[in-house]
Amino acid sequence: MVRPKHQPGGLCLLLLLLCQFMEDRSAQAGNCWLRQAKNGRCQVLYKTELSKEECCSTGRLSTSWTEEDVNDNTLFKWMIFNGGAPNCIPCKETCENVDCGPGKKCRMNKKNKPRCVCAPDCSNITWKGPVCGLDGKTYRNECALLKARCKEQPELEVQYQGKCKKTCRDVFCPGSSTCVVDQTNNAYCVTCNRICPEPTSSEQYLCGNDGVTYSSACHLRKATCLLGRSIGLAYEGKCIKAKSCEDIQCTGGKKCLWDFKVGRGRCSLCDELCPESKSEEPVCASDNATYASECAMKEAACSSGVLLEVKHSGSCNSISEDTEEEEEDEDQDYSFPISSILEW
């Protein structure tokens, strides 16, 4: 029996093909990055050992690729000390087949590079006047608000048409929402929660600034919403017939301030440091004194232990008596934040 002779040529050919494959794979493999910085370098590593085709298949405009397949130490030095990876190749050179998502369009910038910019569809907007946003700011129109939402505030919505107001007068809230004036005298449209669970503990009772005991924070918020302006929290627990602040126990580092107008005390935060800013607007307080800012007024109240409220902005001599009467009923609260009013 004659055995076939071993042919080394076949094994060499196999090894040659394997080496060629490894070389091709090594040449194609690189690093995929999520963005190219202004300095031209790749930043935010997405994945290693990817070909350019694999990296750029994500369709993201900012995705970039580097050909060099380097070790982890080099990658670390690039990202920490060098501002990114060199020889950065952007996946997209034009706006062709670029999907920027809703409210955005791809446009070539001055450097002839594709960029996604905010371009909301405003064709169906019927109201052309100013609108008040959920952030309490007035926008010249709804389209301007949509651009602001696209850029930095994804939760921003129109709460009512017209400029943001300090009173619920002439505010028309959409749907079933109700206008509420918060403790900073800003009007907001909120939806009143008309169903509150019954309290399960006596620790849930709260005393409002109106001298009424509420079963829980939910009941206080509900009353605030239905009333249309801030009630505010005086202190935790049921309301008591206190003769002075000595009868009231404040928690959470708060201090009791006595309201001589109604003969009640309320717990207020007194650890606020007033900034040295010349841009602060002076306020006229309930003691008919003018303070450099609302913060300065609160500081004086905490120092004296007597509650002070803002009657109006500006000097006490800079506004008519009619306007004072209109704003006299607005209740000021130091310790009941706006988020507590609006979270239903």
From Swiss-Prot:
Residues 1-29 form the signal peptide. It is found in: Secreted; Nucleus, Nucleolus. GO terms for cellular component: extracellular region; extracellular space; nucleolus. Keywords: Disulfide bond, Glycoprotein, Nucleus, Repeat, Secreted, Signal. GO terms for biological process: cell differentiation; negative regulation of activin receptor signaling pathway; regulation of BMP signaling pathway. Its main location: secreted. Disulfide bonds join C32-C55, C42-C88, C56-C91, C95-C106, C100-C116, C118-C150, C122-C143, C132-C164, C168-C179, C173-C189, C192-C225, C196-C218, C207-C239, C245-C256, C250-C267, C270-C302, C274-C295, C284-C316. CDD domains: KAZAL_FS. Residues 30-103 form the TB domain. InterPro entries: Fol_N (IPR003645), Follistatin/Osteonectin_EGF (IPR015369), Kazal_dom (IPR002350), Kazal_dom_sf (IPR036058), Prot_Inhib_GrowthFact_Antg (IPR050653), TB_dom (IPR017878), TB_dom_sf (IPR036773). Residues 314-344 are annotated as: Disordered. Residues 112-166, 186-241, 264-318 form the Kazal-like domain. Glycans are attached at N124, N288. It holds the Pfam family FST_N. GO terms for molecular function: activin binding. Residues 94-117, 167-190, 244-268 form the Follistatin-like domain. N-glycosylated. FS-303 may be derived from mature isoform 1 by post-translational proteolytic cleavage. It is the most abundant form in ovaries. Interacts with GDF11. Interacts with activin A/INHBA. Interacts with myostatin/MSTN. Multifunctional regulatory protein whose primary function is to antagonize members of the transforming growth factor beta (TGF-beta) superfamily including activin, myostatin, GDF11 or bone morphogenetic proteins (BMPs). Mechanistically, binds to these ligands in the extracellular space, blocking their type II receptor-binding site to inhibit downstream signaling. Plays an essential role in muscle fiber formation and growth both by preventing the repressive effects of myostatin and through SMAD3/AKT/mTOR signaling independently of myostatin. This is Follistatin. It comes from Sus scrofa. The gene is FST.
